[in-house]
């Protein structure tokens, strides 16, 4: 009878395992943990990626994220609208060399093309100034000038040549083209500020004119120059150009802030460099290795674009906090996950950079976890995994992929990661961390699937009646809530269960991998309601370690909090992408 019962039990076990293998990760959760709601840190990772096109952000500090992703060689590159006023659209299609169109406050537009008949950029500043420069070789027409809508200077030195047209009083139009039939250009000095100099014939000197000691026109006839007008307005604007085959078109400095340089060299397609208030710079070229515009806005935003096959798409720094890096390489991108709490035995003597990690702000003293207390740590709660393609793989798929340091070359090849790269180093570090033995009094495992996490939790607790909790940002008052800020505790409650708990932290890897560890019995878990300085509401999970006597005296937490091992409980908040498990009851 016992033998029959044993065989029947084995049959049921095999049937259960076979049935579980047919379940999706979400279904597996519900079958094993029917009374445990799934936290957002887990549910956000249930959409499976198509390997190997997976990527994760590199997190270097709280609120300062670096995102890398890959795009195909024919992909359309980043579209950006800033304050509804600036639009950048750059296409990497090999059939076109069109450079970016830009509208600033609905007033400035840059459009350029490097085809032989292309127009160089049109610019409208404050809806009043228009610059149009044509590279057509069929004309040398130079500007006519009207100042205050009252003065018109027009001269001609050949049947074909016209000089410049100009409208002043904030309504200036420059049109320059380049017939080789004339070299005549005006010299003009207005209040000692404007100067035009050009040449018209081998022998002739044209009249000098002084009007109120302010305007001087001198036209000389040196045959060796094709220099176009130099103009200085209030010591601030300078135009210099040449119509020779290697000539440069005008340079312009407006209030010491804007510079335009356009070259008519047949061998170059370089478009204008622009500096606005010392802050914006555009440089572009569509040669095979050329860079597209660099832009710095208020010293905070930078765009760098290249159309070469290995080029980088724009880097953007917004308020010094977020950095986006997009690569056209198909290689997998990873998250650089820095968690100041993962290794409780870490030493700042061995890794002094830990003290600079913004996650150190997550440490606090348990006595401050009271209603009305202010956490003056400039906290930032960042859910990195929510914006990436790093998802859980079904256990069958995850188990089929090697996961050990010895097999790193095969793993890198599988995910298209170049050996020796930063991503390869991150993956290697994750594998080594997972292979380290657990700390004293702990049990740990690296789970490569959601099913593996569930199995680790239930086997460690010996029960399936558990709670899972993650930090959740409930509301953001304003966009600036992404900044690190002080929070005030509006409520605290102890999480159900006593004794040991399990904490799971995400690791740097192409797909979702969590390091889970069962902590000592001397830990307590809390849920704290926090309100930020700007009104942001956060339901934060906090873990307190009541016995730190065996911690490394050089642990970063002791330096941050100014305490010694074994004296007071050391607590830390959990980031939204981590999970804390407790036994219910």
Curated annotation (Swiss-Prot):
Residues 63-82 are annotated as: Disordered. The keyword Signal applies. Residues 1-20 form the signal peptide. The keyword Magnesium does not apply. Keywords: Signal. Expressed in leaves. Residues 363-584 form the BURP domain. This is BURP domain-containing protein 17. It comes from Oryza sativa subsp. japonica (Rice). The lineage of its organism: Eukaryota, Viridiplantae, Streptophyta, Embryophyta, Tracheophyta. The gene is BURP17.
């Amino acid at each position: 009878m016992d033998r029959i019962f044993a065989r029947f039990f084995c049959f049921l076990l095999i049937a259960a395992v076979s049935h579980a293998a047919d379940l999706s990760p979400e279904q597996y959760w519900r079958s094993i943990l029917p009374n445990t709601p799934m936290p957002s840190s887990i549910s956000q990772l249930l959409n499976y990626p198509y390997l190997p096109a997976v990527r994760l952000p590199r997190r270097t500090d709280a609120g300062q994220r670096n995102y890398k992703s890959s795009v195909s060689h024919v992909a359309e590159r980043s579209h950006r609208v800033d304050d509804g006023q600036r639009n950048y659209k750059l296409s990497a299609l090999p059939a076109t060399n069109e450079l970016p169109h830009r509208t600033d406050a609905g007033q400035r537009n840059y459009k350029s093309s490097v085809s032989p008949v292309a127009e160089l950029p049109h610019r409208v500043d404050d809806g009043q100034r228009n610059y149009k420069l044509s590279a057509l070789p069929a004309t040398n027409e130079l500007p006519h000038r009207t100042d205050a809508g009252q003065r018109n200077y027009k001269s001609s030195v050949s049947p074909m040549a016209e000089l410049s047209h100009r409208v002043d009083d904030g309504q200036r139009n420059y049109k320059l083209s380049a017939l080789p039939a004339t070299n005549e250009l005006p010299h003009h000095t207005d209040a000692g500020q404007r100067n035009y100099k050009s040449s018209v014939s081998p022998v002739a000197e044209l009249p000098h004119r002084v009007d109120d000691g302010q305007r001087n026109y001198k036209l000389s006839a040196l045959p060796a120059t094709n220099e176009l007008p130099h103009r200085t307005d209030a010591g601030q604007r300078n135009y210099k150009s040449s119509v020779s085959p290697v000539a440069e078109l005008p340079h312009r400095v407006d209030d010491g802030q804007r510079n335009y340089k356009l070259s008519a060299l047949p061998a170059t397609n370089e478009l204008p460099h622009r500096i606005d208030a010392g802050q914006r710079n555009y440089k572009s070229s569509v040669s095979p290795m050329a860079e597209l515009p660099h832009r710095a806005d208020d010293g905070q935003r930078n765009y760098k674009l290249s159309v070469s096959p290995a080029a980088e798409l724009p880097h953007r720094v917004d308020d010094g906090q977020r950095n986006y890096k997009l690569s056209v390489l198909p290689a997998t991108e990873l998250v650089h996950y820095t968690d100041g709490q993962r290794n409780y035995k870490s030493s700042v003597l061995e890794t002094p950079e830990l003290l600079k990690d913004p996650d150190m702000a997550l440490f606090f003293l348990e006595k401050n976890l009271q209603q009305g207390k202010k956490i003056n740590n400039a906290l930032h709660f960042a859910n990195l995994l929510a914006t990436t393609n790093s998802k859980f793989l079904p256990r069958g798929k995850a188990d089929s992929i090697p996961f050990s340091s010895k097999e790193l070359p095969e793993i890198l090849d599988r995910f298209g990661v170049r050996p020796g790269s930063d991503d390869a180093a991150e993956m290697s570090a994750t594998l080594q961390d997972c292979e380290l033995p657990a700390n004293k009094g702990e049990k740990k495992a690296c789970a490569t699937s959601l099913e593996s996490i569930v199995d680790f939790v239930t086997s460690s607790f010996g029960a399936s009646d558990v709670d899972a909790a993650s930090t959740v940002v409930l509301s953001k008052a304003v966009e600036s809530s992404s900044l690190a800020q002080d929070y005030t505790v509006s409520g605290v409650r102890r999480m159900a269960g006593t004794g040991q708990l399990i904490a799971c932290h995400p690791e740097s890897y192409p797909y979702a991998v969590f390091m889970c560890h069962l902590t000592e019995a001397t830990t307590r878990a809390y849920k704290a309601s926090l309100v930020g300085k700007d009104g942001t509401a956060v339901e934060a999970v906090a873990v307190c370690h009541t016995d730190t006597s065996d911690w490394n005296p050089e642990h970063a937490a002791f330096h941050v909090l100014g305490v010694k091992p074994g004296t007071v409980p050391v607590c830390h908040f959990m980031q939204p992408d981590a999970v804390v498990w407790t036994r219910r009851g």
